[in-house]
A protein has these predicted regions:
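A short, basic/flexible loop-to-alpha-helix module at the beginning of a structural domain
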Residues: 119-129
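Phosphate-coordination loops involved in phosphoryl transfer and adenosine-cofactor binding
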Residues: 1, 82, 132-135
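Rossmann-like dinucleotide/phosphate-binding beta-alpha-beta segment
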Residues: 127-186
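Short acidic low-complexity segments
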Residues: 30-41, 54-55, 170-185
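Short, hydrophobic beta-strand segments that form beta-sheet elements in well-ordered domains
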Residues: 5-6, 28-33, 43-48, 63-68, ...
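Short, structured coil segments at secondary-structure junctions
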Residues: 27, 60-61, 79-82, 155, ...
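N-terminal glycine-/charge-rich "phosphate-binding" loop or analogous flexible N-terminal tail
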Residues: 1-43
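Phosphate/diphosphate ligand-binding glycine-rich loop within oxidoreductases
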Residues: 43-118
């Protein structure tokens, strides 16, 4: 029996319990998924970064911590975390991130804030450069970075990507490793 602790607020538990139960059952796993469990019996933790869990020390048997969100910046430096940290990436998360990145890239590219907030009654004729003349760099080319880079490249932006490890992505000029970080920013 695999003991999985859901470490998050009640609202998140209500939202995630059924989908997690279904996904684990579909994979034929024998598991116990609970919002509380004695720390010494926990095999895995499903971690809500906004939840109350801050000290991972008592979870000595824990084999991995899976974050519910793509961002891990609030837990990656937690000195009590000794188990491997994974993050959840699914189709909807990826799609949402692509929409957000493309939306804000276009917002800045087209100068939408000037149009929305510059309502002083004075007409200003501004010619926006084509996407092909506006390079974009994405730092981090994991599942989310890659999807965003591909979407921006499909819109005609020249996209540069940087990753810690070597990757090949069609339509994206890639740099990898610390040595090439500054080149990606040029």
């Amino acid at each position: 029996m695999i003991n999985i602790l859901f470490a998050g607020h009640q609202q998140r538990w209500d939202e995630y319990q059924a989908p997690l139960d279904e996904a684990l059952t579909d994979r034929g796993l024998e598991f116990s998924l609970l919002p509380s469990c004695p720390p010494e019996e926990v095999d895995y933790i499903v971690y809500d970064p906004s939840g109350p869990l801050e000290d991972f020390t008592p979870y000595s048997r824990c084999q991995a911590v899976m974050g519910l969100w793509a961002g891990v910046e609030n837990v990656v430096d937690n000195s009590t975390l000794s188990a491997p940290l994974t993050r959840m990436v699914d189709q909807n998360l990826t799609r949402g991130m692509v929409e957000w990145v493309v939306g804000h890239s276009l917002r800045h590219h087209l100068g939408m804030d000037r149009h929305l907030f510059g309502q002083d009654g004075i007409w200003r004729s501004e010619i926006t450069p084509l996407a092909a003349d506006r390079p974009i760099t994405i730092l981090g080319m994991g599942a989310l970075g890659r999807a965003c880079a591909e979407a921006l490249a499909d819109l005609g932006f020249p996209v540069t990507g940087w990753s810690r490890t070597r990757k090949r992505i069609t339509g994206v000029e890639m740099y990898c490793g610390e040595r090439w970080f500054n080149n990606a920013l040029k």
